[in-house]
């Protein structure tokens, strides 16, 4: 008994000792893991850049569980969570994370991490959440991620990854969320995705994924969100998608999916969001979609859908947004489209082929806020009770065929913000009731036929930011109260019939950025209050009658980019328009501005068009304009500019139009002009340039028009002109060029106007000119020293309308081939030494076309004196035709007169015959009192009583109407 007790005590002691040892080992082991986690975390910290000091308390001197971003287990023995989202850290993700074997959640999202996702991440067997989205990670998604068998959430979106989605993803049997949007992924969706039976959300948006959507997707039976928009998926939507009955969101927008929309989508009765926009779906919209009773947002826009509108809000009772724009839908909106109590808020049917009148059914959609029926074929008038839609904020009906006036009731739609009615056939006035719309932000009525004054009440719409009435017939003045529109940024009134001055109050529209008043009948001067328009970027006042000098205060408008004051009567200096350094267009053409061109214009480095033509500007062209390297149009023509063309303009390499004509510029044409390789039009005419035309012009291969006429240029025409193969117009008239026309001109095959008149060119006319078959407007070689014969090749210029070879020393005959120029309207061969017969087709040209030659003859000149009888009788087609017509008319007239006489005499013979039957011998008395025996063969007067043919034609008439001859009583 004592021994038993003793033995029990020994066993108890052994058990306690063993338990103590085990506990000690466990505690030691757990402590070791805690120490191990801190070691690896400090290693990880050393590889990160921490500008915001988010890891500042990661230190051996503090307990690991107090470190920022860490979550420890309940017993604080190891780390189970690491959250450094948005901590501002950078660097790479270390492979050392693999040592945190108890880690369940790792969130490094929204940082600046780079490099690849380490394959060691696949060793974290306890990981349930991995969030690496919104970084700069690159490389492929490691296939080792498929080893994370407990993973439930994987989000890698918004990175710079590459490659395909690894098939090993299909091993994550517990995965609930997979997000890899915007990762540059390629390839197809691996069929292994169908193994993710628990998957709730699949986000593949904004990648370059391609191929078909796999049928295996049906294996994701719990899927609620499938978003794969903005990829390159093709083919049809698999019908198996209809088996995903838990699906609430289906977004396949902006792919290249095709075929018809499967009716099996109607089985997704829990669907609240369906977006198929931007694909290639065709056919009709399946009416089965009306069974989607939970749908709230439906977007089928930008496809090739056709047929009628089959979706009805009466069945889709939870529908809030319907977008069917940019298809080919036809027909009208169904009468049962909408019922009262509808939840529909947005209806977008733009850019289809819908027709009919404005759908009155929409008036039942009392909750509707936005209606876009633009770019269809709707017609008729707007309903007068449109104001039933009290929740309407945006009414977009532009580019249809609506007619009639704007109903006054529009002014009662108190929530209206946008009214887009442009591109219709609306007439009548703007109703004054429009002034009640205090929330109205934008009103665009352009391209209609509306008329009347702009109502003053419109300026009560103090929330207005945009007004566009372009292309109507509005008349009267601009409302004086326009300055009440403090938020106005766009005022476009171009192309109307507005009159009067610009109201000074417009200067109080201080947010105005675009002011377009062009093409009206406005007058007066620019009010000084314009200086308050500090945000203005564009002012177009062209084609009006504005006058006077510009207010100096306009120089305060520092943000101006586009100014067009052309075709007005402005005067004074243009300096007030140079306050902005942001000008891109300055057009002051056809005014009365004077003074010099301000060199300060060169501060606008982005200036592309500078047009100052038709003014009274003086002085020289500022050399500073050479700083305008973006300039493509420079027009300083029709001024009084003097001096040389500054060589600094050679820096304007983008210039396409250089127009300096009709000034008093002088000096030589500089070779640097040839460096302007974009030049399409060069006009230096009507100046005082001298010297040679530079051969370097041949480098301007894009030149279409070269006008150097009316200068003092001399020397030979450079042979390099043949390099200008795009040239249409070449005019050297009234200079002092000498020598030959270079044969290289035959290479300018697109010429339709060539004028070399009033020079000292000599030699023969090159036969190569006959190859310029596009010449149409003129070929003018007059007033030169050309000799030799007219080349017959000119007969190939079948399109030529004006040919002038006058005042030369040309000899020989006029080539018969010229007679084939059927388009010729003006011909001048005068003042040469031509002889011989003029082609008969030229007989219709005036004498002046052939005067002062040696021996030219034939119509319209005299007949050739030495001609044979046959030649004398040679007449033009027109003359022959005229003679034939005259003969035919004369013969016809004679025949008609004789026929008339015969008829009259035949009538008399009939009357005598009737009387004779009564037994009497009756004599018919003529108008001259003579008698003819009706029974005798002499029915005509004797020869001594016959008259001439002329007398017969004019006088032989038996006047039965004025002389009564009673033959039978």
Label every PLM stretch briefly.
Residues 1-969:
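Plant-biased, solvent-exposed loop and capping regions
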């Amino acid at each position: 008994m004592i021994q038993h007790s003793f033995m029990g005590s020994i066993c108890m002691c052994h058990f306690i000792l063993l338990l103590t040892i085990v506990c000690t080992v466990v505690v030691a082991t757990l402590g070791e893991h805690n120490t191990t986690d801190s070691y690896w975390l400090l290693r990880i910290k050393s590889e990160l850049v921490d500008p915001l000091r988010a890891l500042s308390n990661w230190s051996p001197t503090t307990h690991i569980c107090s470190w920022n971003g860490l979550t420890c287990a309940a017993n604080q023995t190891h780390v189970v969570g690491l959250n450094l989202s948005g901590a501002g850290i950078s660097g790479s993700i270390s492979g050392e994370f693999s040592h945190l074997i108890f880690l369940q959640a790792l969130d490094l999202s929204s940082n600046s991490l780079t490099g690849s996702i380490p394959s060691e991440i696949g060793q974290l067997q306890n990981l349930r959440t991995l969030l690496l989205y919104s970084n700069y990670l690159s490389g492929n998604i490691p296939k080792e991620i498929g080893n994370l068998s407990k993973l439930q959430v994987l989000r890698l979106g918004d990175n710079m990854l590459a490659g395909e989605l690894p098939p090993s993803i299909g091993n994550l049997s517990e995965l609930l969320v997979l997000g890899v949007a915007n990762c540059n992924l390629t390839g197809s969706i691996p069929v292994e995705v169908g193994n993710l039976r628990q998957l709730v959300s699949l986000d593949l948006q904004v990648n370059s994924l391609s191929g078909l959507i796999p049928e295996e997707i049906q294996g994701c039976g719990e899927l609620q969100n499938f978003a794969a928009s903005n990829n390159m998926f093709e083919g049809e939507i698999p019908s198996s998608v209809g088996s995903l009955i838990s699906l609430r969101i289906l977004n396949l927008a902006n792919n290249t999916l095709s075929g018809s929309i499967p009716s099996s989508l109607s089985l997704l009765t829990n669907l609240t969001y369906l977006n198929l926009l931007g694909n290639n779906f065709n056919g009709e919209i399946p009416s089965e979609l009306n069974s989607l009773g939970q749908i709230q947002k439906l977007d089928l826009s930008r496809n090739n859908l056709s047929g009628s509108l089959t979706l009805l809000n009466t069945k889709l009772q939870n529908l809030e947004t319907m977008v069917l724009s940019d298809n080919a839908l036809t027909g009208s909106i169904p009468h049962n489209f909408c019922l009262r109590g509808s939840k529909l808020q947005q209806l977008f049917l733009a850019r289809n082929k819908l027709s009919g009148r404005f759908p009155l059914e929409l008036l039942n959609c009392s909750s509707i806020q936005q209606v876009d029926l633009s770019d269809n074929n709707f017609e008729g008038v707007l309903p007068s009770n449109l104001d039933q839609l009290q929740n309407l904020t945006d009414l977009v009906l532009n580019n249809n065929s609506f007619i009639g006036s704007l109903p006054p009731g529009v002014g009662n739609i108190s929530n209206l913000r946008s009214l887009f009615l442009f591109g219709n056939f609306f007439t009548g006035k703007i109703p004054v009731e429009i002034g009640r719309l205090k929330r109205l932000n934008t009103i665009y009525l352009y391209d209609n036929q509306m008329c009347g004054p702009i109502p003053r009440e419109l300026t009560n719409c103090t929330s207005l930011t945009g007004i566009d009435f372009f292309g109507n017939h509005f008349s009267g003045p601009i409302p004086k109260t326009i300055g009440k529109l403090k938020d106005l940024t766009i005022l476009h009134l171009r192309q109307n019939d507005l009159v009067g001055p610009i109201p000074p109050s417009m200067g109080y529209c201080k947010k105005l950025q675009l002011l377009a008043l062009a093409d009206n009948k406005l007058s007066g001067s620019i009010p000084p209050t314009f200086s308050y328009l500090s945000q203005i970027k564009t002012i177009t006042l062209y084609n009006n009658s504005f006058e006077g000098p510009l207010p100096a205060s306009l120089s305060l408008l520092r943000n101006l980019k586009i100014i067009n004051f052309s075709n007005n009567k402005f005067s004074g200096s243009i300096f007030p328009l140079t306050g902005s350094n942001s000008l891109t267009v300055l057009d002051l053409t056809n005014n009365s501005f004077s003074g010099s061109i301000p060199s300060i214009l060169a501060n606008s480095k982005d200036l592309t068009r500078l047009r100052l033509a038709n003014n009274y500007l003086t002085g020289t062209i500022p050399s500073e304009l050479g700083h305008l390297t973006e300039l493509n149009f420079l027009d300083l023509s029709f001024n009084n500019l003097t001096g040389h063309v500054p060589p600094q303009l050679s820096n304007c390499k983008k210039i396409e139009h250089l127009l300096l004509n009709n000034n008093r510029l002088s000096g030589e044409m500089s070779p640097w002009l040839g460096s302007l390789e974009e030049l399409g039009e060069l006009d230096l005419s009507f100046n005082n340039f001298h010297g040679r035309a530079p051969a370097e012009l041949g480098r301007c291969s894009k030149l279409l028009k070269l006008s150097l006429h009316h200068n003092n240029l001399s020397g030979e025409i450079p042979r390099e002109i043949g390099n200008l193969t795009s040239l249409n117009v070449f005019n050297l008239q009234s200079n002092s060029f000498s020598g030959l026309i270079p044969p290289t001109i035959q290479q300018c095959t697109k010429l339709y106007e060539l004028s070399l008149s009033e020079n000292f060119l000599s030699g023969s006319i090159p036969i190569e000119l006959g190859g310029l078959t596009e010449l149409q407007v003129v070929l003018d070689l007059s007033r030169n020293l050309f000799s030799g014969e007219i080349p017959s090749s000119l007969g190939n210029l079948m399109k030529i309308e004006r040919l002038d070879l006058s005042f030369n020393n040309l000899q020989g005959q006029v080539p018969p081939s010229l007679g084939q120029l059927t388009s010729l309207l003006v011909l001048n061969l005068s003042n040469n030494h031509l002889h011989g017969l003029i082609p008969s087709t030229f007989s219709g040209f005036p004498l002046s076309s052939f005067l002062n030659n040696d021996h030219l003859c034939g119509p319209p000149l005299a007949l050739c004196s030495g001609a044979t009888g046959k030649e004398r009788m040679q007449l033009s087609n027109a003359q022959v035709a005229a003679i034939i017509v005259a003969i035919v008319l004369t013969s016809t007239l004679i025949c008609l007169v004789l026929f008339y006489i015969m008829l009259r005499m035949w009538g008399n013979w009939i009357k005598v015959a009737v009387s004779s039957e009564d037994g009497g011998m009756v004599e018919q008395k003529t108008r001259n009192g003579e008698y003819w025996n009706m029974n005798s063969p002499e029915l005509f007067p004797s020869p001594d009583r016959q008259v001439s043919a002329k007398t017969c034609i004019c006088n032989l008439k038996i006047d039965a109407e004025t002389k009564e001859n009673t033959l039978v009583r």
